[in-house]
Amino acid sequence: MRSRLTAIILIGMILGILVGYACHILWPDPATAKTIADYISLFTDVFLRLIKMIIAPLVFSTLVVGVAHMGDTKSVGRIGAKAMIWFVGASLVSLLLGMVLVNLLRPGDNLNLPLPDAQASTNLKVTSLSMKEFVAHLVPRSIVEAMATNEILQIVVFSLFFGVACASMGERARKLVEGIEELSHVILSITGYIMKLAPIAVFASMAAIITTQGLGILVTYGKFVLEFYFGLVLLWCLLIAVGFLIFGHHSFRLVNLIREPFLLAFSTASSEAAYPKTMEQLEKFPISKKIISFVLPMGYSFNLDGSMMYCTFATLFIAQAYNIVLPLGQQITMLLLLMLTSKGMAGVPRASLVVIAATLASFNIPEAGLLLIIGIDQFLDMGRSATNVIGNTLATAVVAKWEGEKVHLPEPALRPRVA
């Protein structure tokens, strides 16, 4: 059944490209094409709204149950510390890889495109959280507000307090925890219904993009797009290689398990769309719910490997396009700045572009350079989102391994599910 759905999603993607290209040829006027694309993308918008509808209750219910089953705050702190060690290391590697590749490949040199005026506006609101604001932002003013706006990190903080409180109450909170566990099963059932719409959403997403952009934009920006995806493939290989060192050949089984959420994230350009399915597939590795429900939502705020690599790659690409030379020391400073500013951008629309805009301003690089990549950002976001799924999957599995879970036993079909 899983391979059948994956095949249908692939078919939907291919059909979407064909239909989008036909629409682009039939209606070359940009205004008309945009109107048609808006109607087509309605299916994708509805699908993503359905996914966002279940994320808050899914994170809350699974995390509360997981923490309650841990039984003590020491376990929570230990797992959180191990997860953060991995997140920081993976983010630094991703940023560094982007920096090295853009210096070696130099995609911004000899760019056969007119450069935007340095004073041109990008219409992006450039904001970055200070460390003080970021720490304050971790704590929700209201859990209702946090759930309404899908502030994953704030939901995680509230759920941790709730789960620890339930664990401390022991038997008195048992029925409440059991009820919340049943709620998580209900939400996962809803997820199953929503996932049946995934092929339609993928079809609509691809058709809408190609209708407005056409395939020609990939030719115009071919060098930049190809070199960026080359970097992503290197990052995938690096992550899988680390997985091989830890899990042996079972790392390939882990990658095979997440092919469906990977494809879903790629085709919809949304990591969130793959979140419920990623949880489900990780249980089959198997990884315990308490680890998945804790580490995975944290990863969506702290472990966006694809986005991290893109930030350094795109920022230095724009600098190269304007013939601005940044010494190695400044590039390392930029890397560290990106490491900090990106952590406050979880849940911000087009977060990578906002982070890049803030970084450009900090290093006196024309913010208008963003106009060079805004047109193809959707195509690049597809790769970033898929990479984030791989990174968070591996992070969750590694933390489970560090916690002593037997996550790579043979004959998975013969083993009972880990609670």
Predicted regions and their residues:
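Membrane-interface alpha-helices at helix entry/exit sites of multi-pass transporters
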Residues: 74-82, 189-196, 284-300, 328-329, ...
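Alpha-helical membrane segments and immediately flanking helix-loop junctions
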Residues: 257-311, 338-353, 376-379, 383-398
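Juxtamembrane helix-boundary/capping and inter-helix hinge elements in multi-pass membrane proteins
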Residues: 68-75, 110, 169-174, 182, ...
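Transmembrane alpha-helical segments and their short flanking loops
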Residues: 312-419
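Transmembrane helix-bundle signature of multi-pass membrane transporters/permeases
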Residues: 46, 63-64, 83-88, 161-164, ...
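Signature of multi-pass transmembrane helix bundles
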Residues: 2, 6-10, 17-22, 29, ...
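Membrane-water interface of transmembrane alpha-helices in multipass transporters/channels
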Residues: 32-39, 77, 179, 215-223, ...
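Transmembrane alpha-helices that form the ion-translocation and gating core
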Residues: 89-114, 227-260, 264, 271-274, ...
